[in-house]
Amino acid sequence: MVITTGTALIKPGQVATEEDSADSDSHPRLRAEDAAKAFAARGVRTSIVRPGASVHGEGDHGFVPVLIDIARDKGVSAYIGDGSNRWPAVHRLDAAHLYRLALQDAPAGAVFHAIADGGIPTREIAEVIGRHLELPVVSIAPQDATDHFGWMGMFFAIDAPASSALTQERLGWRPAHLGLIDDLELGHYFAPEARTVTV
């Protein structure tokens, strides 16, 4: 069994590794890791995969399409503060490969990071979105983030760099597909038919 959580809440502001424990008191979703470890202790071959803030690629219905829709609706592509906070990301095909390896080869209780881009400054994400939508790129003050981004403001403000070095060493997994910025540059995120997210 493979449990999915995420890297964003593991160690905000510092590079999260596979050896960092989730503080399940800080967010209910992280309690899934406690459950996975309990199953592993009972002999169930359970592992944990932690993707980053963006699992990207064609058909993405995650946070990046939400940011694009917010930019379209607001008429600007924004980042928060100086935009130096970092988002980790992985291409969906690389993530799928990691899940397969985890199912096949992971020892009970193992933790893996589905991370290719260890930490992309959110300003870079906003700049690519602004360029493709031909919109100004602006900074939003942290106290105004919720007014501008709605529920997404909390997530876009997180500084959550992460590493997958131990995952690559232990499973032989190597990200082979485009990083998030290069994937955005292809343009498929900005096609009219790609707008499927309600802000």
Model regions and ranges:
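Conserved Rossmann-fold NAD(P)-dependent oxidoreductase catalytic core, especially the SDR/UDP-sugar
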Residues: 1-27
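Glycine/proline-rich active-site loop of Rossmann-fold NAD(P)-dependent oxidoreductases
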Residues: 30, 55-66, 73, 101-112, ...
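Conserved beta-loop-beta element that borders a ligand/cofactor-binding pocket
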Residues: 34-58
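A conserved pocket-lining segment of Rossmann-fold NAD(P)-dependent short-chain dehydrogenase/reductase
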Residues: 69-90
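A conserved structural motif in NAD(P)-dependent oxidoreductases
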Residues: 88-95, 106
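Mid/C-terminal beta-alpha module of Rossmann-like enzyme folds, strongest
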Residues: 98-152, 197-199
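Conserved C-terminal active-site "lid" loop/helix of NAD(P)H-dependent oxidoreductases
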Residues: 127, 147-174, 190
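Amphipathic terminal alpha-helices
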Residues: 178-199
